[in-house]
Amino acid sequence: TNDEIIQQILYYLLLNDANPGKRLQAVSLLETVPAHNNKKLVLISSVLSETNTGVRLRALDLLSQFETDKTIRDACLKILLEDQNEAVRMGALSILANSPSADIVPALRVVSLMDQNEYIRERAVEVMTDISYLAEDQALEVIQ
């Protein structure tokens, strides 16, 4: 939906409505809103502050459609290290895995050792391995 007023109402509902069902409906409707910075920031705010797991998962899903910049990466690292819900942590790790960079390795090390979920620990190791291969490839390109 391109109507600016409707977008603002959806943002407001997602971040402020007391009813989790309405927040879930708002985040679902945001799928039709074009990707731009306001939408990204509202989704990040929702995923970091939302109490309802379904809303957080849906917001993360929509965030995964954005190019992973520092703001999204930082939010996903916070989620990965602090969120109580395994599915939400998996979603954050998935976003990080799609845009691997060396600056996430320290957090991935912690997750690979400390996360209570075996799959998340193993996936963190896989992402670190991918990052080390990327670093080797980049070093080879520099040498050549």
What is each model feature region?
Residues 3-14, 36-47, 69-80, 101-113, ...:
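Amphipathic alpha-helical scaffolding segments comprising HEAT/armadillo-like alpha-solenoid repeats
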Residues 1-3, 12-13, 21-35, 45-46, ...:
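Structural detector for internal amphipathic alpha-helices that build alpha-solenoid repeat scaffolds
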